Amino acid sequence: MLQQWLRQSPRAARVLRGSCCRGPQSGSLRHSPLPTAPHRCIRSLQTSATESKERIPLRKQLKQDAKALKAQKRQKRASEEASRTKWELTVGIEIHAQLNTETKLFSRASTSNTDTPNSNVALFDLAFPGSQPEFQATALLPALRAAIALNCDIQPVSRFDRKHYFYQDQPAGYQITQYYEPFAKNGYVDLFPHDGIAPEDGDHVRIGIKQIQLEQDTAKSQEYPPSTQLLDFNRVSHPLIEIITMPQIHNPATAAACVRKIQAVLQSCSAVTTGMELGGLRADVNVSIRRRDEAPGTHQYGGIGGLGQRTEIKNLSSFKAVEDAVIAEKNRQIAVLESGGVIEGETRGWTIGSTETRKLRGKEGEVDYRYMPDPDLPPLIIGHDLISNLRDSLPTPPDQLIEMLAGTEYGLSIEDAKPLIELDDGARLEYYQDVVDILRDLQQDKDAKSRGGLARMAGNWVLHELGGLCTKADLAWDAQRVPAETLAQIIDQLQRKRITGATAKQVLAMVFDGDRRPVPQLLEEENLLLRPLSRDEYLALAEAAIGQNPQMVEQIRAKNQLGKLGWFVGQMMRMGEKGRVEAQKADEILRELILGKSDQP
């Protein structure tokens, strides 16, 4: 009834709304206020602060955000520097790498990881009573290559030990390893800035390797929540080497660089077939913290004393996980010590994407493992002749290859040299060297100055242009898809200015897609050869481009903004016949017309 009266009497509605806003007074209507009326009234009386505030221009907002981000980074760096000044981080790493072998370490079962679960299993792998270990000598060769490449001293006599523990992935109740007398000792790995070490570590870090030991892998566990766990014993007794570094790492980035470098060394000498990305290499890190202004700690690790209590983080499966886990554990230990707590020696875990490590179990000591010599295995005796032959047959170490590629012979940047070495197990590097050799033969009629940049140009085409086509097509590297001679001929035509850069990329794509015509024939039949423009044609194109934007011309003349010449070059290339306008000549003509500078004699 009231609502109908209000609709028929707008003036009464206004009075009632005003009364609602003023609150109840004597003589006012006794009816309850309408549910929506106060809200309408309140909105009509309020003024929004955000509406009256000036809107910040987008460019200004972006600048403010960039400044805030820089300030945060400066604050973070200052905090990290203060932490480094006060606390000393010490890291040691244990790397477990699956060796490149066809048979297991103590049985003739296959090491294939693609077969049906539990199909490559010998009686000894499952610890059947009465079964005996049979050492497979073929597993020793990749292990020796790894040890030599890591600058270790090979021991003429080494022995196997049993490491006792009870877990479902180890059916024998012990793991065969080389705890007391490993086959290799006293090695090292050198790290440089291009390996990714922390800037505060300088230009060179040498990390000692305490020992490398042969051991057998465990079964692979697969969990199916909530309560099912399956075991694949194909992996049991797969040959491993455990590489134990000295605790000489003091930065998380350097810890990750160390693992990355060791993996690269192992792959370069064919000691392993896969790396961290496919599970062929796993890392455990030991982390300890101590205050720099206090007396050295009482703990010892790897023969180095004065350390804080260490914790071990198990089964890290990526380089980023190594760095992130060390950072998280460092921060956790610092927080515990600063709050008056005590670091417990324990084993901890790490989950990708997490910010904290988690406790798995109390750290087991050496006595708990009850190490003892394995009575079923004789000593491992390694002859000096075998070591000498393997040493002579090893490929050039990665560091020497980088030094060669970045030197005067090739002149590549470190950023280009590293992937050439690391990609495709050396196949990309071999292909690149073939391209350079052929290209230099094709350019013999040129002077030394013209030939000086051929290797750098070839590196760009192999890595970025051809590599980009492989990536885009999601294809593995195949040197026969674009033979080295074909790529060298394309680059040669480009160097002689018979084709443009765009045409060279077009021809490369055609060959990549299966065109097998010789390069000269392809260029002729597809009408891709560059037909140079005359000077008058360049002048006409330049004048047309200048006429499109006279304001920009004035900016170039008045403020010497030479970078804007590139816009006019682009316009000339768009207006001209495809493939005929050379950017360098277009730039020369533009400078002559706009700046009055001519390269003509």
From Swiss-Prot:
Record-linked PROSITE patterns: GATB (PS01234)
Presequence range in chain numbering: 1-52
GO BP of this protein: glutaminyl-tRNAGln biosynthesis via transamidation; mitochondrial translation
GO CC annotation, single: glutamyl-tRNA(Gln) amidotransferase complex
Keywords of the record: ATP-binding, Ligase, Mitochondrion, Nucleotide-binding, Protein biosynthesis, Transit peptide
Alphabetical list of Gene3D superfamilies matching this protein: 1.10.10.410
Main location: mitochondrion
Gene Ontology MF terms: ATP binding; glutaminyl-tRNA synthase (glutamine-hydrolyzing) activity
EC number(s) per entry: 6.3.5.-
Protein localization: Mitochondrion
Complexes and interactors: Subunit of the heterotrimeric GatCAB amidotransferase (AdT) complex, composed of A, B and C subunits.
Family: Belongs to the GatB/GatE family. GatB subfamily.
Main function: Allows the formation of correctly charged Gln-tRNA(Gln) through the transamidation of misacylated Glu-tRNA(Gln) in the mitochondria. The reaction takes place in the presence of glutamine and ATP through an activated gamma-phospho-Glu-tRNA(Gln).
Designated name of the protein: Glutamyl-tRNA(Gln) amidotransferase subunit B, mitochondrial
